[in-house]
């Protein structure tokens, strides 16, 4: 069996960075910085603002990678909600350690959204998963779990009002406010119920200590369990980020998603600069791509760093920022010697020429150049295709709380962008393959909508798009339940090969004939779960595919499958030369298959 070889860790960055002024065990002023990472758990830096010296405290609970909710209370205790473990952590300066206080709400609160404090010092935590609400009393070290604040939506962002009631901003499909009374357990919707994509709404604490609803449907003050209409909303209450002497802290490289260079700005105008050489374990890899220059390019996730691996000299380089979308690149495609990078959030497109110097920006001449969102709905551009009409095409999951991910295109010559909304109803376009002989694009869909939604359709489909006449010419699906067409490939024989998942059935490979418009074959994938975008043509005319536990070879002539590499595989990658590349978490790897 073919062996797996290690290349290295392309990116070591951090995410969900927050900072607060505080004091150490000895009472000296310090800065607390909270950072997340994928290859290890979240951590806290305690920084001396005079010297830049720091100590690093890493959470010990497995799966606590992301500090998605943070709060510094009035007694200098720093609280952190960790995703996706759903645990609450506390850095107590008196104990001088990072403590795991326990699970917020077992099996329900995997992603803490916001932490706030009421007048009695009790913490209130809202979470993603079930839009639940939980309190934690530092005096008794007890959690009290109050359950869902909404029966449909999944995100809860609470704020404690001055009367002891808790206002919960519920997102994503119909954002609205729910007021919860801890004394009697009653909850009530107050103010407008908005629709994502049509209206706006936010919940704020203002300088008068009151909570307000600011929405496109009106402005309101929350009094008890009522929303009272107001003409104006006071300024928001500011969070103190200054040290006792008035000094402020900042990262000068935060716009590059690096967070290593820090500055302390003194009230007298003096500036102290520090390099923070903390340990970061590595950022997970989200996508791998074969560039036009024979190198492998890829994207880390949260934050998005663009990286390059050169097989000729084994050079592995973190190139840095390539998009104003800071999440991750979902897909890429090559056209006329350039790489087009499609990134989350917002399905933002960047254009990169590997033959020219690297200088990110948004202006002509920048390289990579961010040219903006491809449309107003697309958010997670799962597939990018180059070629038809000289354009870049994307298939995307829509924005949070929305359904109906479109097929969209961008013309690099003119800068024109176009989206075909509602092309598959409440499903989303997901995968793409080019049929040059038929002058069509094959589009595979998923039943999923944007994050925070439940599917409205039961079956994913494959459809053929006539890009010249801008219309569907055929659509259909397999005779089995399908949730997602998660890989599509035009084989050297002109047929479409793909993988489908979901519907309570084993995942399958299929063959589709674009001439007869029939699914001619379908059969189980080898062991494991088929990876997204996990199919490609090899130099030998065969098709190579990834599952979560193997790499396999499919002979189009016989449809025989041979497993050629066994192991663990997280993200599929390209064939370059004799090697096939892939990644597991933060590690880039390859196997020699030719």
Give each language-model segment a name.
Residues 48-52, 92-96, 137-141, 181-185, ...:
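Short loop/turn segments that connect beta-strands within beta-propeller blades
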Residues 6-13, 58-62, 102-107, 146-151, ...:
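Surface loop/turn motifs at the tips and blade-to-blade linkers of beta-strand repeat domains
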Residues 566-594:
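Blade-level signature of beta-propeller repeat domains, shared across WD40, Kelch, NHL, RCC1
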Residues 37-38, 84, 129, 172-173, ...:
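Residue-level signature of beta-propeller blades and closely related beta-rich strand-turn architectures
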Residues 12-23, 64-70, 109-115, 152-160, ...:
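Repeated scaffold domains used in trafficking and secretory/extracellular systems
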Residues 394-404, 443-459:
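Short, conserved, GDST-rich strand-edge loop motifs in beta-rich repeat architectures
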Residues 43-45, 87-89, 132-134, 176-178, ...:
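A short loop-to-beta-strand structural motif that recurs across blades of beta-propeller domains
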Residues 30-34, 77-80, 123-125, 166-169, ...:
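Conserved beta-propeller blade signature
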């Amino acid at each position: 069996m073919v062996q797996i070889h290690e290349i290295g860790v392309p990116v070591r960055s951090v995410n969900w960075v927050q900072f607060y002024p505080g004091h150490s065990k000895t009472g000296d002023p310090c800065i607390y910085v909270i950072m997340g990472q994928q290859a290890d758990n979240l951590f806290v830096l305690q920084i001396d603002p005079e010297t830049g010296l720091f100590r690093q405290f890493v959470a010990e609970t497995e799966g606590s990678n992301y500090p998605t909710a943070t709060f510094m209370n009035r007694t200098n205790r720093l609280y952190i909600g960790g995703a996706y473990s759903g645990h609450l952590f506390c850095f107590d300066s008196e104990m001088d350690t990072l403590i795991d206080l326990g699970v917020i709400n077992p099996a329900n609160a995997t992603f803490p959204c916001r932490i706030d404090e009421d007048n009695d010092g009790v913490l209130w935590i809202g979470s993603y998963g079930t839009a639940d609400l939980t309190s934690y009393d530092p005096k008794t070290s007890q959690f009290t779990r109050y359950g869902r604040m909404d029966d449909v939506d999944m995100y809860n962002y609470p704020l404690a009002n001055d009367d002891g009631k808790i206002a919960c901003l519920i997102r994503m499909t119909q954002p609205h406010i729910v007021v919860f009374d801890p004394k009697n357990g009653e909850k009530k919707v107050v103010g407008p119920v908005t629709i994502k994509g049509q209206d706006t709404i936010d919940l704020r604490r203002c300088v008068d200590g009151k909570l307000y609803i600011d929405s496109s449907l009106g402005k309101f003050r929350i009094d008890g369990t009522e929303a009272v209409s107001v003409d104006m909303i006071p300024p928001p209450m500011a969070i103190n980020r200054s040290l006792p002497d008035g000094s402020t802290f900042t990262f000068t490289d935060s716009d590059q998603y690096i967070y290593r260079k820090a500055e302390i700005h003194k009230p007298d105008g003096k500036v102290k600069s520090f390099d923070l050489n903390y340990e970061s374990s590595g950022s997970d890899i989200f996508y791998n791509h074969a560039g036009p220059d024979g190198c492998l390019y890829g994207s880390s996730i949260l934050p998005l760093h663009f990286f390059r691996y050169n097989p000729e000299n084994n050079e592995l380089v973190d190139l840095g920022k390539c998009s104003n979308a800071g999440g991750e690149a979902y897909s890429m495609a090559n056209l006329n010697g350039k790489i087009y990078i499609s990134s989350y959030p917002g399905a933002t497109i960047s254009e990169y020429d590997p033959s020219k110097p690297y200088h990110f920006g948004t202006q002509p001449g920048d390289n990579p150049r961010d040219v903006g969102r491809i449309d107003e709905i697309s958010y997670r551009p799962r597939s990018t295709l180059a070629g038809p009409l000289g354009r870049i095409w994307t298939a995307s999951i829509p924005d949070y709380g929305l359904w109906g991910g479109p097929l969209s295109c961008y013309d690099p010559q003119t800068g024109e962008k176009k989206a075909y909304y509602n092309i598959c109803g409440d499903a989303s376009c997901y995968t793409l393959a080019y049929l040059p002989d038929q002058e069509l694009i094959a589009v595979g869909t998923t039943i999923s909508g944007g994050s925070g939604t439940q599917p409205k359709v039961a079956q994913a489909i494959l459809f053929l798009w006539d890009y010249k006449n801008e219309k569907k010419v055929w659509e259909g699906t397999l005779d089995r339940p399908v949730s997602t067409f998660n890989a599509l490939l035009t084989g050297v024989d002109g047929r479409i090969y793909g993988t489908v998942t979901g519907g309570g059935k084993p995942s399958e490979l299929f063959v589709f004939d674009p001439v007869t418009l029939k699914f001619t074959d379908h059969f189980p994938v080898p062991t494991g779960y088929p990876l997204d975008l996990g199919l490609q043509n090899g130099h030998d005319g065969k098709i190579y595919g990834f599952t979560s536990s193997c790499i396999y070879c499919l002979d189009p002539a016989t449809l025989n499958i041979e497993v050629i590499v066994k192991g663990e595989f997280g993200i599929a990658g390209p064939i370059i030369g004799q090697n096939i590349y892939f990644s597991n978490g933060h590690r880039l790897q390859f196997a020699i298959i030719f």
